[in-house]
Amino acid sequence: MFRWAIIFAVIALLASFLGFGGVAGLSANFAYILLALAVILFIVAFVSRRT
C-alpha cells in the first residue's frame, strides 16, 4: 500500500510540473488517503500483535 501511495505522489508531482492541476490534485488526494490507510492498518496490526 505504501508503494501505491508513492506512485500516486509521483504522478501528482509529474502532473503538477506539466500543468495538469486537476490530475495533480486528484493524485495527491489518492496518495494521502492510501498513506493514511496504510499507517492506520500498520498501527492496528502492531497493537493487535502485542496483545
UniProtKB/Swiss-Prot annotation:
Keywords assigned by UniProt, alphabetized: Cell membrane, Membrane, Transmembrane, Transmembrane helix
Protein's cellular compartments: Cell membrane
Cross-referenced InterPro entries: DUF1328 (IPR009760)
Segments traversing the membrane: 6-26, 28-47
Signal sequence range: none
GO cellular component, one term: plasma membrane
Disulphides: none
Membrane topology: Multi-pass membrane protein
NCBIfam families: PRK13682.1-2
Family that this chain belongs to: Belongs to the UPF0391 family.
Protein name: UPF0391 membrane protein Psyc_0130
